Amino acid sequence: MNYKVASAKNIATLLFLFSSQSQAFDLGKIAKIKAGAESFSKVGFNNKPINTNKGLYPTETFMTIMAYMQVDFAELLPKSATANGHHLDGSLGGWGGAVIYDTTKDFINEVTGKPYGAMAWNYVGYWGGLVGQKPWASCGLATGNLTQSQYDKMTQAQMTQLSNQEALEASTCAKTYADHTRNYVIYNAYLRYNYKDIFEIRGGRYESPADYMSGYNQGLDMTLNLGNFKFWWFSSFGRGFAYNEWLYNFYSPKTYTLKNGQTINPGVHAFYIIWNYKGWSIQPFVYFSPFNEYDPNFTITYDSNPTFTGLGFRSQTDVTVLNPFYAKRFWDTYQFGMPAGKNAHSLMIKQKFEWNEYNFGFGIYKSFGNANWMIGYHGNRLGFDFWTNTVYANTLNSLSYMMDANAFTVFAFGGGVHRKLLWGLLGRLTYGPRANEQVLSLNLGYKFTKNFSADIKFEYYNMLMHQGYKMGWNGPKLDSQPATDQDRSHIFTEIVWKL
């Protein structure tokens, strides 16, 4: 398989050729332009100074401004082809923006008496090259990078000293990323062919439909429908973000270094076999990244009213089990503050009810072993945002501790849509070996016009880090580290304008 995905330039050339080779094509008829501007802000309530030795970090406040333009080509084939069920469409779109306010630039580290450094690049502008080949990407963002056998040779005092030292090095590394941001991305650049409702193939850059690879995909996917069966293949050789909170140019989330030192992009791939019958859906599927992980999984869902359109009653049940197996080189390492191990499992059970314009439900999410550090955190079927921690958590990202090894989460939600107003409530309790979390959030959204809408979320978020564990350290337990209780409460706002 050719791992090199067509560039945006090649896609644009193809679109031009298709649209210009026949007089039957009228650009005004086949092309539709979309454009808009959006803004996102997060307001954190914990503004205490940083102390890297104690593992104490504030909750960031930042604001973005974004704009995009997209050209959609609805049909690129002549009527003689479409009459026989053949269709070809495509899209080309670009997104750009910037952080216009960022409190992380001013947070002081009490250990050094100096600013820790800007961290908003973690949301907007992160860039180290497709496979992390850029010079600044070789520094250590993560702490606790030794193996268990190496830690076994160290005393507790030595590990504590190492955790303090690496936290300062991570700060220096973060500053180099802040100096090399890339605040734009060609997020859409694809062609899609389908034949009736039987076969479809799409390649290029497009928003990922994969449950466990969110964002935008650089790769391809294929669908084959045969009666009650659906077969779906997905390949990703790059992941990007083009949203008002997140803006990343494409990077490979899974890489492998050859013996000669060259880093390659083996991609992330998935294959689903889906059987649908009278509301039931049984989905055995596998995700894998060569040299990294192999995950045989399954999902079973039941929908009592698949044609639900907002009137009447609907019940939806979702049971998903993930079973990641890791490459041998990871077995002795620490990931998300816990040993990776050979393999792990996770279980999600989610129940949702809808009655006219209202919805409510509940669920559980349980990890057995370190199940999420490869597959679970790049995307999930949970249906809510679990990236609302501080940007300093887990060594420089805002991932919730509900993704930790052996963590157990119970959650409940409810909401409704009333003409132009929508609202939602979410409560979550997480119990884990590293941290407990209590979350309660209220979301409100209003569509003022067909072109303008706004949303706001209020979230109470308390995080209790257990004794022996320190934020910013992903290595073994530190006996001298006391428990810490840190406030992660915040407000999200979103403003969206579409042309």
Describe the residue ranges of each PLM region.
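Outer-membrane beta-barrel translocator/channel fold
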Residues: 232-297, 303-386, 390, 456-493
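C-terminal structural cap/anchor segments
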Residues: 364-447
